[in-house]
Amino acid sequence: MSPKTETKASVGFKAGVKDYRLTYYTPEYQTKDTDILAAFRVTPQPGVPPEEAGAAVAAESSTGTWTTVWTDGLTSLDRYKGRCYDIEPVPGEESQFIAYVAYPLDLFEEGSVTNLFTSIVGNVFGFKALRALRLEDLRIPPAYSKTFQGPPHGIQVERDKLNKYGRPLLGCTIKPKLGLSAKNYGRAVYECLRGGLDFTKDDENVNSQPFMRWRDRFVFCAEAIYKAQAETGEIKGHYLNATAGTCEEMMKRAIFARELGVPIVMHDYLTGGFTANTSLAHYCRDNGLLLHIHRAMHAVIDRQKNHGMHFRVLAKALRMSGGDHIHAGTVVGKLEGERDVTLGFVDLLRDDFIEKDRSRGIYFTQDWVSMPGVLPVASGGIHVWHMPALTEIFGDDSVLQFGGGTLGHPWGNAPGAVANRVALEACVQARNEGRDLAREGNEVIREASKWSPELAAACEIWKEIKFEFEAMDTL
C-alpha cells in the first residue's frame, strides 16, 4: 500500500469561484508592441455586466478556468494572462459591446495559425455567460508575423512569373462544377484560355470524384494549358485543386502538378484546415508553384453579424498561413460583400502597412513588414457590365473571375473569354486615359462592343441581370 500523501496548497491559495473581472479586466493596462490584440463583439447574457463578459473572454481564451486552482501559484499569471483592457458600446445596439483583449506573445506557438485560433476562437465561443461572441479583428505584431513564411510568392513574383503587368488578371471557374468527364473538362479549359483568359479554375468541390479522378483532370488540363500557350504566346494557368481527405494525398497531388510543369495549384483552406494549408504553402514556395486559395465554408463562420469571426480575421490568417490568391467577394456580384468593408480586408491582404480605420472595419493598425501580399479574387455572379466597377474598385492587383460570365456566352467559351478580355482592356485603357469608370463605365463598354461582336453579344445577353440584395456584412 502506498503511503498516504497530502499536497498542500501554497500560502494564500483560497479555493472557490471569483469574478473574472477581478483578475482579467485591467483598464489601466498599456498594450505592448509585442501583444496580439483582439477586438471581440460581445453580447452578454442578461444581468452579466460588460466588464465581466469581456474579462471572461480574456480569461477563457488564455489562462483562466471557471474556478480558482492552486496551480496558479506555480506560474506567473500576470505574465501569461489575457487582459481585457477596454470596452466600448456598439452604436445602435443596446446589448452589444466591443471588448479589446491583449494577449502576451508567449501564449502562442511560432508559425502556427492552428494554435493561434485554438486559443483565441476556441472554447470561449461556447461560453454560457455570453449570448453571442464575434471576433472582429486581430492585430498581429511583427514579432509574431515574422515567424510565418506567408504567401509562397506574392504579387510581384507572380506577375514576373506570368509576365503580365498593368491590369487585373482574368479567370474563369469551369461549369458545370460537377459532372464533366476529364477530357470534356480539359476542352472547356482550353477554349477559355485560348480566348484570352489568364487562368481557369477548378470549383471548390472538384476533388477526385467517380466521374472525374484527379489525375485524369490534371493531365487533360495540363494539355489544355500547353496548347493554349502555344497558340496565344501568353503564359496560362489552371487552378488544379489539390484539396484531399488527407495531407499526404494533398501533397501527392501537388507533387504531380509540379511534375506536369503547370504554374499553379489550389486549396480549400478552411475545409482543408490551416495545418494542411501551411504545409502546402511551404511546398509551393520550395517548388515554384503559385497557390490559389478558395474560402469555401467562410460564410458559416463570418456571415452572422453578432457571432463567429469576421472575414478580415480569416484573411489575415490566410496571409500568414500562405496563399497567393484568395476569394474576397465582389461588391457587385451575387455573393456577400459591402464596399468599404470589402476594401478594408482587401487592403489587409495586399498592402504592407494598413492604418486603423473604423469606417472600413479596421480596428487596429497592421504592419506586415516584408511579408508578401495576396491577390484578392473577385468572383461570383459577375459579367461584362460589371467590368468598369470591378476595375475601379479592385485596381490592377486583383483577379477578376467570370464563371457563368464566360461559359454562359451564347457563342461558347472562347467568345465568352474574348468578350471579357476586350471589356477589361477597354476599361484599363479608359482609366489610364483619365476617364471616370464610375460614371462612364457603361459608355466605355458600349464603345468597345462596336468593334467586338463577342462583347456585343455578351452585353445583350446580360443587360438585365442584377443581384440587388442588401449586404449583411455592414459596419
From Swiss-Prot:
Q: What is its main location?
A: plastid
- N6,N6,N6-trimethyllysine modification sites are K14
Q: Which Pfam families match?
A: RuBisCO_large, RuBisCO_large_N
Q: What residues bind substrate, as annotated?
A: N123, T173, K177, R295, H327, S379
Where's it found, cell-wise?
A: Plastid, Chloroplast
Amino acids binding Mg(2+)? K201, D203, E204
RNA-binding among the record's keywords? Answer: no
Which cofactors are required for activity? Mg(2+)
Provide the active-site residues from the annotation: K175, H294
Q: A Gene Ontology MF term for this entry?
A: monooxygenase activity
The positions annotated as site (Transition state stabilizer) read K334
Q: How is the cofactor bound?
A: Binds 1 Mg(2+) ion per subunit.
Propiece span(s): 1-2
Tell me its EC number(s), please. 4.1.1.39
Tell me what reaction this enzyme catalyses.
Answer: 2 (2R)-3-phosphoglycerate + 2 H(+) = D-ribulose 1,5-bisphosphate + CO2 + H2O; D-ribulose 1,5-bisphosphate + O2 = 2-phosphoglycolate + (2R)-3-phosphoglycerate + 2 H(+)
| The record's account of how the chain is modified after translation | The disulfide bond which can form in the large chain dimeric partners within the hexadecamer appears to be associated with oxidative stress and protein turnover.
> Which SUPFAM superfamilies does the record associate with it?
RuBisCo, C-terminal domain (SSF51649), RuBisCO, large subunit, small (N-terminal) domain (SSF54966)
N6-carboxylysine sites (modified residues):
K201
Respond yes or no to whether keyword Disulfide bond is given for this record: yes
UniProt KW keywords: Acetylation, Calvin cycle, Carbon dioxide fixation, Chloroplast, Disulfide bond, Lyase, Magnesium, Metal-binding, Methylation, Monooxygenase, Oxidoreductase, Photorespiration, Photosynthesis, Plastid
Fill in the misc note: The basic functional RuBisCO is composed of a large chain homodimer in a 'head-to-tail' conformation. In form I RuBisCO this homodimer is arranged in a barrel-like tetramer with the small subunits forming a tetrameric 'cap' on each end of the 'barrel'.
Family per record: Belongs to the RuBisCO large chain family. Type I subfamily.
Subunit info?
A: Heterohexadecamer of 8 large chains and 8 small chains; disulfide-linked. The disulfide link is formed within the large subunit homodimers.
In UniProt terms, what function does this protein have?
A: RuBisCO catalyzes two reactions: the carboxylation of D-ribulose 1,5-bisphosphate, the primary event in carbon dioxide fixation, as well as the oxidative fragmentation of the pentose substrate in the photorespiration process. Both reactions occur simultaneously and in competition at the same active site.
Q: What is this protein called?
A: Ribulose bisphosphate carboxylase large chain
Organism expressing this protein natively: Picea sitchensis
